[in-house]
Amino acid sequence: MTKDLNTLVSELPEIYQTIFGHPEWDGDAARDCNQRLDLITEQYDNLSRALGRPLNVLDLGCAQGFFSLSLASKGATIVGIDFQQENINVCRALAEENPDFAAEFRVGRIEEVIAALEEGEFDLAIGLSVFHHIVHLHGIDEVKRLLSRLADVTQAVILELAVKEEPLYWGVSQPDDPRELIEQCAFYRLIGEFDTHLSPVPRPMYLVSNHRVLINDFNQPFQHWQNQPYAGAGLAHKRSRRYFFGEDYVCKFFYYDMPHGILTAEESQRNKHELHNEIKFLTQPPAGFDAPAVLAHGENAQSGWLVMEKLPGRLLSDMLAAGEEIDREKILGSLLRSLAALEKQGFWHDDVRPWNVMVDARQHARLIDFGSIVTTPQDCSWPTNLVQSFFVFVNELFAENKSWNGFWRSAPVHPFNLPQPWSNWLYAVWQEPVERWNFALLLALFEKKAKLPSAEQQRGATEQWIIAQETVLLELQSRGRNESAGSEALRGQIHTLEQQMAQLQSAQDAFVEKAQQPVEVSHELTWLGENMEQLAALLQTAQAHAQADVQPELPPETAELLQRLEAANREIHHLSNENQQLRQEIEKIHRSRSWRMTKGYRYLGLQIHLLRQYGFVQRCKHFIKRVLRFVFSFMRKHPQVKHTAVNGLHKLGLYQPAYRLYRRMNPLPHSQYQADAQILSQTELQVMHPELLPPEVYEIYLKLTKNK
């Protein structure tokens, strides 16, 4: 079997992974797999413990099967997929060496395997440094679809994703941020970053799921999730916050950094600050405040999370939107008691809104969004006075007019439109000096509101003027927001077109340069041809939207946007025609007989150019490196020749210089997770070659072994 395995390994295009159970090939592996294995094993153990059994694992792009067989040794049932027969041959030979393992290996294409998967067939899927090839072949959208399906039919997916910055042929096909491939999935979390043998650019590793919250100390299924804090929140926080709801828990997952750089530094800091604030408050709640228990929390460079006990009930905002009957007396009473208790301890909630109040079956209200609990008595928005803001909240609770859509709040500040005795209560507060306003006063007057004098009978001209003015202001705000919606939509479409224009201009510049010094048709030209119809459709949509939404008398800003839209249309057609002509010219050149006849001349010219650019010495070094790479590759494929050469170098005393040269040309990968493994590798090297020990230790070693 050893001879057969040697032959199979020598036939590999590349020894990419560590060969399971055969340390003699560790030095030949392109990547050290042990650091990634530690993380993968940790996630396997967490999921296995949560499900209460060994897992069924799918390894996509299994290469030489190191990760598959390592998990099989823990009791997992493995199916490994790779499109190269040579890799599968090695995997099967290694599986035969370990007959107790439940491991099966097949030749196949990842796209076809994912399409044929059934839900529940596998618990865990692994895809390490493989999907960038599919992106290059089929595009970003297709890979997003594949990964969505993979997350749908498994409990968890572990992905190592290549990045655009890597200097390789497929780099230009990759998304600007690898998270673009998985952002459509419910849950994803960065768990590590690793260098590769191809470049010093690290590749991120993500844990992905459409079914579970996967945190090291918390692994539970969720019933549903949303990227809005409440219904109707729109683009609040730019969808950088995700909320997962389990049977008895709620998980808040805040991203500090998002694809496309959509979060500003201030927005990122706000996410981080509010999460830290909520964790701090809930782990040390003030005495007498009924806070949910914290189940787990943590963060990394990209995100932070908090898992807490799920409170019973529904959001007050949802109940109001549905027109349900609510007991305002109980809701306001319980809410005021909570706010007064917080105030007594030196805390205030700066965002008391219907969507931050949970109401249970007994109509008892409880505050949520504990990240908004602060030590400064000031609201997070207009009006900044907390008592005034609470006036607006009470008006929202009684509001019959749902049509207002204000810039900040959509209900009045004054209490004069409220029914009795609620108007009497807030008017009594209104009459107090502002410096006396607090929640203790609100609660005290609330409890005796039935005995307070009528607000309507005390109303004067000033109050009547306030009612009239605030009604007009709210109406104007609503109209302003509605009328600006069309312009906002146009502005977004103009921005998209300008981005497409910039890409077209870059493509044109590249084509002009390539027409002067012809080479093969680039991917930009292909991209242009494939996307012209999409650009034209987008432009027509923008024009239709403009005609439908903009009134005959256009505001100057909207008219300017339409002019820019028309200019963009003309520029796109102009660039399209020029690029089509360039493409035809390049194709004519490549089909010509002279192009084929001058292939050797062009190669010779390239070598002369490189010689002039780098000099004779550098070109000689380059030639020597190519020869040495061929020799090293030949020896890796022929272990017996390698063994003979190593013995000969030892006898001649040249092994260490040769080994250093080999390592210089084939460096081991390094990453922030490799420190322990590097120390271990150095120790093993010293055991094998005592002359590498420190001089004092080596002298003691010689004394101990000289009589043996």
Curated annotation (Swiss-Prot):
<feature type="binding site">
    <location>
        <begin position="241"/>
        <end position="243"/>
    </location>
    <ligand>
        <name>ATP</name>
    </ligand>
</feature>
<feature type="binding site">
    <location>
        <begin position="16"/>
        <end position="17"/>
    </location>
    <ligand>
        <name>S-adenosyl-L-methionine</name>
    </ligand>
</feature>
<dbReference type="GO" id="GO:0032259">
    <property type="term" value="P:methylation"/>
</dbReference>
<dbReference type="InterPro" id="IPR029063">
    <property type="entry name" value="SAM-dependent_MTases_sf"/>
</dbReference>
<feature type="binding site">
    <location>
        <position position="237"/>
    </location>
    <ligand>
        <name>ATP</name>
    </ligand>
</feature>
<feature type="binding site">
    <location>
        <position position="229"/>
    </location>
    <ligand>
        <name>ATP</name>
    </ligand>
</feature>
<dbReference type="InterPro" id="IPR025714">
    <property type="entry name" value="Methyltranfer_dom"/>
</dbReference>
<dbReference type="GO" id="GO:0005524">
    <property type="term" value="F:ATP binding"/>
</dbReference>
<keyword id="KW-0418">Kinase</keyword>
<keyword id="KW-0949">S-adenosyl-L-methionine</keyword>
<feature type="region of interest" description="Required for membrane-binding">
    <location>
        <begin position="601"/>
        <end position="669"/>
    </location>
</feature>
<comment type="pathway">
    <text>Bacterial outer membrane biogenesis; LPS O-antigen biosynthesis.</text>
</comment>
<keyword id="KW-0067">ATP-binding</keyword>
<comment type="function">
    <text>Regulates the length of the LPS O-antigen polysaccharide chain. Stops the polymerization of the chain by phosphorylating and then methylating the phosphate on the terminal sugar. This terminal modification is essential for export of the O-antigen across the inner membrane. WbdD is also required for correct localization of the WbdA mannosyltransferase.</text>
</comment>
<protein>
    <recommendedName>
        <fullName>O-antigen chain terminator bifunctional methyltransferase/kinase WbdD</fullName>
        <ecNumber>2.1.1.294</ecNumber>
        <ecNumber>2.7.1.181</ecNumber>
    </recommendedName>
</protein>
<keyword id="KW-0448">Lipopolysaccharide biosynthesis</keyword>
<keyword id="KW-0175">Coiled coil</keyword>
<feature type="binding site">
    <location>
        <position position="61"/>
    </location>
    <ligand>
        <name>S-adenosyl-L-methionine</name>
    </ligand>
</feature>
<dbReference type="GO" id="GO:0008168">
    <property type="term" value="F:methyltransferase activity"/>
</dbReference>
<comment type="similarity">
    <text>Belongs to the WbdD family.</text>
</comment>
<keyword id="KW-0472">Membrane</keyword>
<dbReference type="Pfam" id="PF00069">
    <property type="entry name" value="Pkinase"/>
</dbReference>
<dbReference type="InterPro" id="IPR011009">
    <property type="entry name" value="Kinase-like_dom_sf"/>
</dbReference>
<keyword id="KW-1003">Cell membrane</keyword>
<dbReference type="Pfam" id="PF13847">
    <property type="entry name" value="Methyltransf_31"/>
</dbReference>
<feature type="binding site">
    <location>
        <position position="252"/>
    </location>
    <ligand>
        <name>ATP</name>
    </ligand>
</feature>
<feature type="region of interest" description="Required for localizing WbdA to the membrane">
    <location>
        <begin position="687"/>
        <end position="708"/>
    </location>
</feature>
<dbReference type="InterPro" id="IPR000719">
    <property type="entry name" value="Prot_kinase_dom"/>
</dbReference>
<feature type="binding site">
    <location>
        <position position="128"/>
    </location>
    <ligand>
        <name>S-adenosyl-L-methionine</name>
    </ligand>
</feature>
<feature type="binding site">
    <location>
        <position position="36"/>
    </location>
    <ligand>
        <name>S-adenosyl-L-methionine</name>
    </ligand>
</feature>
<keyword id="KW-0489">Methyltransferase</keyword>
<feature type="binding site">
    <location>
        <position position="369"/>
    </location>
    <ligand>
        <name>ATP</name>
    </ligand>
</feature>
<keyword id="KW-0547">Nucleotide-binding</keyword>
<feature type="region of interest" description="Kinase">
    <location>
        <begin position="211"/>
        <end position="459"/>
    </location>
</feature>
<feature type="region of interest" description="Methyltransferase">
    <location>
        <begin position="1"/>
        <end position="210"/>
    </location>
</feature>
<feature type="binding site">
    <location>
        <position position="274"/>
    </location>
    <ligand>
        <name>ATP</name>
    </ligand>
</feature>
<dbReference type="GO" id="GO:0004672">
    <property type="term" value="F:protein kinase activity"/>
</dbReference>
<feature type="binding site">
    <location>
        <position position="358"/>
    </location>
    <ligand>
        <name>ATP</name>
    </ligand>
</feature>
<feature type="binding site">
    <location>
        <begin position="108"/>
        <end position="111"/>
    </location>
    <ligand>
        <name>S-adenosyl-L-methionine</name>
    </ligand>
</feature>
<feature type="binding site">
    <location>
        <begin position="82"/>
        <end position="87"/>
    </location>
    <ligand>
        <name>S-adenosyl-L-methionine</name>
    </ligand>
</feature>
<comment type="subunit">
    <text>Interacts with WbdA.</text>
</comment>
<keyword id="KW-0808">Transferase</keyword>
